[in-house]
A protein has these predicted regions:
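Structured C-terminal cap/extension of enzyme domains
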Residues: 18-24, 38-139
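Short N-terminal secondary-structure initiator segments
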Residues: 1-11, 47-55
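Distinct, well-ordered alpha-helical segments
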Residues: 4-20, 37-40
Length: 139
C-alpha cells in the first residue's frame, strides 16, 4: 500500500494507483477536506483498493469549527451522539468503504470513536447536508 497525508501528493498517488496493483491506500479525508472525493476515492473503488483514512478530524479543525454547538437534528438520523461520531460516520459512508483511523490518547475518546461503527450511516443526501453545514463554519 501507499500512504500520504498531503493533498499535494494526490497526483503522484493517482499515478502509482494507475501503474501498480495495491492492496490499500491511506490518505487524508474528512468532512472538512474532501479533496480525495473527485479522483482518488472513485479510483480506489474502481480498482478494488481498500481505503484507510488518516486525519478524519482534520487535525482537530472540525472540532474547532463546531465548538460547543449542539448536534444538529439530523445527527439522530445516523444514530450519532457526538461530533466525533458525526465526523467518522461521514468518512465511513463514502461508497469506497473508507475506514477512518482516528488517533487519540484518551480511552473515553476511543470508546466514543468506536461507537461511530454502530447504527446508520448517512446517505448521499445527508452527506450533502453535512457538507453544507460544515463548510460555512470552516470559512
Amino acid at each position: 500500500g501507499v500512504t500520504t497525508s498531503s493533498d499535494r501528493q494526490y497526483e503522484a498517488l493517482a499515478d502509482v494507483m494507475n501503474h501498480h496493483t495495491l492492496d490499500f491506500i491511506q490518505l487524508d479525508y474528512s468532512l472538512g477536506n474532501r479533496n480525495a472525493n473527485d479522483r482518488l476515492l472513485p479510483m480506489a473503488l474502481d480498482k478494488g483498493v481498500a481505503v484507510l483514512v488518516n486525519l478524519p478530524f482534520g487535525r482537530g479543525r472540525l472540532f474547532n469549527a463546531v465548538g460547543d454547538r449542539s448536534l444538529p437534528d439530523w445527527a439522530a438520523d445516523i444514530d450519532a451522539t457526538s461530533w466525533a461520531q458525526v465526523f467518522l460516520k461521514y468518512v465511513m459512508s463514502h461508497p469506497s468503504g473508507a475506514i477512518p483511523i482516528p488517533g487519540t490518547t484518551k480511552p473515553h475518546h476511543a470508546e466514543d470513536n468506536l461507537s461511530a461503527a454502530r447504527g446508520r450511516l448517512p446517505d448521499a443526501n445527508l452527506r450533502r447536508e453535512m457538507e453544507n453545514f460544515i463548510d460555512p463554519l470552516l470559512g
